[in-house]
Amino acid sequence: MSLSRRIFLGSSIGTVLPAVAPKSRVVVARDPKARALDLLDRAMQSFFDRNSPAEAWRQCIRPGERVGLKVNCLAGRGGSTSLALVEAVCERLQQAGVKPGNIVIWYRLNEDLDRAGFRLSTASGKIRCLGNDVLGYESELSVFGSVGSLVAKTLTQQCDAVINLPVLKDHGIVGVTMALKNMFGAIHNPNKYHPHAGDPYVADVNALPEIRRKIRLTICDGTTAQYEGGPTYMPQWNWPFGGLLVAQDPVALDTVGWRIIEQKRTEKGMKPLKEMQREPAYIATAASRGLGVNDPARIERLEV
């Protein structure tokens, strides 16, 4: 990977950063003409520095594991995780040794998945696709900080690892909805945690042990992104970003994604989210909880 393709956020030319300071890599792969599978391969191979898709996937998923794909389907067709991306992830997981019956695509409700174009299935031995309403939630409350929630059984009982598949978009209450906010779909009471622009609630949901220990990777779908009016689908505020964001650090990914959305808002003559009283301060709170880094100097943004 050439140095010309690497951007160290917040660092200046000539700055030598201490070798002991860990950096979180966020790959931003863009090509509006590329197939989802090709763009995914480029992003994954770049993120893990591997020569083949299978090698890349084996860095985060083991063949015998049960893998959950946490999509975002609230906006229906057009504003949800794309079918093409999910199909590409499923294909590569299987090539990396994960059995079809060990893959489950999930979201809050069957109805949401159906509206977004996903084919519901609970068939044994095949890729499953189901809402939390199928298996329900654990009976014991999970608590961290400001949050007390029941966690979806799909996550706790059907997944050894989770690939988080949010969408790159604005959120009318909490500012942005990407890696961190997408995990509201894993709890029974997400509507309770939107006050104060989601701070500290979004961070604390992600700090719940059942969630924190299972998230292996985030692949943020920026094929079509949205800079205003989210989380519902508002085509007048969409733009063809034509890319994917990949990271294992959800805080770093949200930091980069937030910057992308703010840049587009500036281009369109819109006020920054802070002036709209919905700055996503929960990102910094998540960093303080040890969920990742939001310091630009500790984020390696890799454009491919």
For every predicted segment, state its role.
Residues 2-304:
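N-terminal and secondary-structure boundary signal
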